[in-house]
Design a protein with these regions (language model features):
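Secretory/periplasmic and organellar redox-cofactor proteins
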Residues: 1-3, 79, 88-97
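Rhodanese-like catalytic fold shared by cysteine-dependent sulfurtransferases
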Residues: 2-83, 102-105, 111-152, 158-219
Length: 219
């Protein structure tokens, strides 16, 4: 990454890798190709957005116990997988007011409360957490959702990789995770059913539904 002139954050853990990288498009593509050459990372997915300036000041690589801190020893998300819901399917469900089986769709925001305050889907549930590790403790508050269609979502889909399987393991029957998160939804569906902006963790601060930066750093 450094040799390619990229800046950003790379998080490494036993459960995988999560990277936010910025630089010339060709350099990012080259690094992505190199990562996918590792047999463990062949299915690595990337979400792209463009910025007028580099939104990171340096390259930071960190090894962590968890990519997203849940603090649930023994929990294995692979034991209770939750399907990914394509953005276009979610929009169709929201347009119709129900899923393909006629069931009400409940949107559950898995982000921190201050992120939700900046923007979220209309009518989404806000668990009111200040850090993701509190999410599990809120599940009992939503026992009435166990027999309803729940779609979890977060910025890029990473937190939902744990939140949705955790809900499945807790007895929520029909739980999805929004594929690619909010940013992928913006890319495919624009701002339909969305209110406000979406917080991102770089110098842009937040993105509008057209993926333009609230703070672009160009002036």
């Amino acid at each position: 990454c450094a040799a390619a002139g990229l800046k950003g954050t790379v998080l490494l853990a036993h459960e995988g890798i999560n990277a936010f990288l910025a630089g010339p498009e060709s350099a990012v593509a080259t690094v992505l190709e190199q990562l996918r050459s590792d047999p463990r990372l062949t299915a690595l997915k990337a979400k792209w957005s463009w910025s007028a300036t580099l939104p990171f000041k340096r390259l930071w690589v960190r090894v962590k116990p968890e990519i997203v801190t849940l603090r649930r020893p023994g929990f294995d998300r692979r034991a209770s997988p939750a399907p990914q819901l394509p953005p276009e399917t979610l929009r169709r469900w929201l347009d119709a007011g129900h899923d393909d089986d006629g069931r009400e769709v409940v949107l559950l925001d898995t982000r921190n409360a201050w992120e939700v305050a900046v923007g979220s889907f209309a009518g989404a549930i806000d668990p009111g957490i200040s850090r993701f590790s509190q999410f599990a403790s809120r599940l009992d508050d939503y026992a009435d959702l166990r027999d309803r269609t729940v779609v979890t979502f977060c910025t890029g889909g990473i937190r939902c990789e744990k939140a949705a399987p955790l809900m499945k393991a807790a007895g929520f029957d029909t739980v999805y995770q929004l594929e690619g998160g909010i940013l992928r939804y913006f890319e495919v569906c624009g701002g339909a059913h969305w209110r406000g902006d979406c917080v991102v963790f770089d110098d842009r601060q937040a993105l509008r539904p057209d993926l333009s930066a609230v703070v672009d750093g160009s002036s």
